[in-house]
Amino acid sequence: YFGKVYRKETMHKGRSSEFFQGGVELMNKPGLQGDKEVMTMIQESLPGISLKNILLELGSAKFYNRLLELVGNQRNELEDILRLRDISEMKRFVSKNDFEESLNQLLLSLPTCFGNIDLLHQMMDKCQDSVLLGALQELKDLYESLDSKEKIIFDLGMVPTMKYYTGFMIKGYSD
């Protein structure tokens, strides 16, 4: 599906409450096979919707949800910081909590943690948590399975817009 969506905007006054949203429902094809089918369908459909210079941004709800588990009762604050991509608040958040150093370094990188496949490789090298690493590996596997890799970036600080998201997430941007 693809169409106009209207959402009440409380945080950004003056921001349009109308935007376009597309979605795909895929059943009975779990894991990489299903994710690849969805991505391929999206990539093949985009030229038909008259948008120019489309960039696809991939994130992981599994990665995000694990971060929330790791920060425990500080999850709401982390969610707000990531949603706003507030670097100074993230520094304050890390300094006031007693997380492991590897988690601190990961958290500090998240507000600006978006880029190409090289960024994903760098983050995989830094990740110490097996669930986080598994989520990053799933993104890497998806990327490597695609025939068309151009105009795909990763955003590891992406916040799911719906609580029920569990796997990869995608946002599209156009001129």
Question: What kind of feature is each model-predicted range?
Answer:
Residues V38, S60-F63, D86, E138:
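Internal, well-ordered alpha-helical segments in soluble enzyme and binding-protein domains
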Residues E18-G22, L58-R66:
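Short, conserved phosphate-binding/catalytic loop or strand-edge motifs used
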Residues N65-R75, Y164-I170:
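Short glycine/threonine-rich loop-to-helix capping motif typified by GTGT followed
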Residues N73-F99:
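Acidic, His- and aromatic-enriched active-site or binding-groove loops in soluble protein domains
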Residues L55:
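Glycine- and acidic-residue-rich phosphate-binding/metal-coordinating active-site segment common to enzymes
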Residues Y1-K52, K96-D175:
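Positively charged, Gly/Ser-enriched RNA/tRNA-binding surfaces
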Residues M41-P47, K62-G72:
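Hydrophobic mid-domain F-helix/FG-region of cytochrome P450s
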